[in-house]
Design a protein with these regions (language model features):
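Aromatic-anchored segments of alpha-helical transmembrane domains
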Residues: 32-36, 123-131, 204-215
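Alpha-helical transmembrane segments of integral membrane proteins
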Residues: 14, 18, 22, 26, ...
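Membrane-interface loops
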Residues: 44-55, 67, 105-198, 242-257
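C-terminal membrane module of polytopic membrane proteins
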Residues: 203-204, 216-257
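Interfacial helix-loop-helix junctions of multi-pass membrane proteins
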Residues: 137-144, 169-173, 208-234
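Alpha-helical transmembrane spans of integral membrane proteins, capturing the lipid-embedded, hydrophobic core
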Residues: 23-35, 94, 98, 119, ...
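N-terminal transmembrane-helix/juxtamembrane module of multi-pass inner/ER membrane proteins
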Residues: 2-95
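Hydrophobic alpha-helical transmembrane segments
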Residues: 87-102, 178-186
Length: 257
């Protein structure tokens, strides 16, 4: 058994233990800093968040694209859809992201560092959005017919729980990092796996997550668009600046296995 583990170690740890520890620390530090800044809420932020959300509603109505109430109302008529979407929002987003990053690190190590950089850059861009444009999500506007689908699904009010944690900000809606991260992972995995059905499934994942965040009233569709734009900008920066600076280490290697 020990011999077998030693034989597997070079593949599981393509750059050795020090690099693995370094990657874990980078993500842990970036994520904690992201959550800490993201969780900064005060009275001014709360007032501004609702005002910004009303501005979004006004803009979407002027474009005749205020579709979020209709999307959720349709989902609520089909309990299995709203329950599945709520489950996806709570349980699938983070495990899929972490699992994909682990797979990339082990099996597509040459591409992992580029994707890592895109994630870290996108977190930084998202934090700017949360500070500059705090926005209340649709679920906080029952007057428009919205329900908190996720709270109904898990059995307690997530916004009430959020007020007890300095790491949670109910007004961190713009951009949608659920959509941003889903797009980063979805595009990356669709280019790095071999089975056609799996490539197709990963390519649909960002669209699925966009539907999930809207039907559960956690984001406006404009949040989702800005989340996708955040991923695009982060990818452009990672390619134009970082990958050029260290092409042998930080460039994307798109070969499938």
């Amino acid at each position: 058994m020990l011999t077998r583990l030693r034989a597997l170690a070079p593949r599981a740890l393509p750059n050795g233990w020090p690099d693995l520890v370094r990657q874990v620390l980078i993500f842990a530090a970036a994520y904690y800093a992201y959550r800490l800044v993201r969780g900064a809420v005060d009275g001014h932020t709360t007032a501004a968040a609702f005002e910004h959300a009303r501005d979004i509603i006004g803009l979407e109505r002027s474009l005749h694209l205020f579709v979020e109430p209709s999307v959720q109302a349709w989902g609520e008529t089909k309990p299995w859809i709203i329950d599945f979407a709520s489950w996806m929002y709570v349980n699938a987003h983070l495990p899929l992201m972490i699992g994909s990053l682990i797979w990339l690190y082990i099996f597509r190590n040459r591409s992992y560092y580029f994707i890592r950089n895109v994630f870290v850059i996108s977190m930084g861009i998202a934090l700017v959005g949360y500070v500059v444009f705090p926005t209340a999500p649709p679920r906080l506007f029952p007057e428009w017919g919205f329900q908190d689908s996720v709270s109904n699904f898990i059995g307690f009010n997530t916004d009430t729980a959020s007020t007890t944690s300095s790491l949670v900000n109910p007004f961190a809606a713009v951009p949608s990092v659920h959509v941003c991260f889903a797009l980063i992972i979805g595009i990356s995995m669709s280019r790095l796996v071999r089975p056609k059905w799996l490539r197709f499934a990963w390519s649909l994942y960002p669209l699925l997550m966009t539907f999930v965040v809207i039907v559960t009233a956690n984001h406006w569709w404009m949040d989702a668009v800005l989340g996708a734009l955040t991923a695009l900008v982060a990818g452009t920066i990672a390619q134009a600046l970082l990958a050029r600076a260290r092409p042998n280490k930080w460039a994307f290697a798109g070969a499938r296995i």
